[in-house]
Each structure stands twice: as structure tokens, then as C-alpha cells.
């Protein structure tokens, strides 16, 4: 879950492994995102916190009824929250790519940055991606890499598809993934 920041048990959804982002880095990313026309989404293990939600994103979240979110007015609302992922949301992907170009190099080195759904720039700690999480899960379950099939459709799935013994892209995959 969350690009590999969480590994949950299918039996009861308890957290098997969690990888959090540095709180200080999250604070800097939040302040940076405030300069742009983006909805900022901050994920903890069980709650999605949203700053500057727009109508389009609100409709999308309502469509996914299982998504519990809380609107926030500032980063201060996140005091004591263990942050596992952040996202900048804008429906213009070129705009998100421009934001990435303006990020300090040290952030790019500290982050695992990916894009998804033609609307999100996803920001995780550098140690996190779906491929690494799949490898950890395979080790926990004693499953050989060659016995794993991974299916994906977005840029954030690339590491998982590459790790698996058989990587599959769905028919409508982004071209650079397939």
C-alpha cells in the first residue's frame, strides 16, 4: 500500500511492515507544495490528510468510498502523525513535471518520486518503492522471485513489474511502462 510504504496482512489488514518519511522532509515538501496550484495529500497508516482539496479530487475520493480523509488548514495539524507518503495533485501532468524541475537536488536524492493516474506526483522516502516492498513480502512469505507475477499500469508500478519473475502491463498502460 502507498507505493510499498505499508505491507498489510490480507487476513486482517494489520500492518506487517511500515516505512515512514522523515517528518522534517515532509514539512519541507508541504511548504514547497503550498507555492503551487496543487492539492497536497499526506498519508498516515490509516488516514489521508488533505490540504487545499479541489472539487474534482473531492468527487474522485467520494467515488472510492473506502477512502477516509480529513481536510487540514496547515502542516501544524500533522503534529505527531507518522507520515508514510505525500502527493501533489493537479490534472495537468506537465505542470507537475515543472514542479519536479524546481525541487532541490537533495530532495530528489532523498525521495522516491513517481507519477500516477495522470494527476499525481507521488513522494515517498527513497527507501520505498513497490519493487522493494514486493521483495520484502516475497521474503516474508518464502516465495521465490521467479514465482511472482506483478501487474501494473502506471509509472509507480515500474519497479514492481521489473522485480517480478513475470511483469505484466495492462492494455491501457502508460506507454513508457509497457
Predicted feature descriptions by range:
Residues 1-18, 22-24:
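Alpha-helical substrate-recognition element adjacent to the catalytic core
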Residues 28, 32, 36-151, 155, ...:
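Conserved acidic, metal-coordinating active-site core of Asp-based
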Residues 171-172:
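Zn-dependent metallopeptidase/amidohydrolase metal-coordination segment
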Residues 175-177:
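Conserved small/polar residues in nucleotide/adenosyl-binding loops
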Amino acid at each position: 500500500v502507498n507505493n510499498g510504504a505499508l505491507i498489510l496482512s490480507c487476513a486482517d489488514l494489520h500492518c506487517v511492515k511500515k516505512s515512514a518519511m522523515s517528518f522534517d522532509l515532509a514539512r519541507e515538501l508541504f511548504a514547497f507544495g503550498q507555492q503551487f496550484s496543487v492539492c497536497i495529500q499526506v498519508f498516515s497508516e490509516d488516514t489521508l490528510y488533505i490540504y487545499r482539496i479541489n472539487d474534482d479530487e473531492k468527487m474522485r475520493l467520494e467515488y472510492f468510498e473506502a477512502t477516509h480523509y480529513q481536510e487540514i488548514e496547515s502542516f501544524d495539524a500533522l503534529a505527531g502523525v507518522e507520515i508514510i507518503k505525500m502527493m501533489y495533485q493537479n490534472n495537468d501532468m506537465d505542470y507537475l513535471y515543472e514542479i519536479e524541475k524546481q525541487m532541490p537536488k537533495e530532495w530528489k536524492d532523498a525521495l522516491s518520486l513517481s507519477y500516477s493516474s495522470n494527476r499525481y506526483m507521488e513522494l515517498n522516502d527513497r527507501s520505498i518503492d513497490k519493487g522493494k516492498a514486493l521483495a520484502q513480502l516475497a521474503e516474508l512469505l518464502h516465495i521465490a522471485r521467479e514465482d511472482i507475477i506483478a501487474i501494473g499500469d502506471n509509472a509507480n508500478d515500474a519497479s514492481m513489474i521489473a522485480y517480478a519473475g513475470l511483469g505484466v502491463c495492462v492494455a491501457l498502460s502508460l506507454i513508457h511502462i509497457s
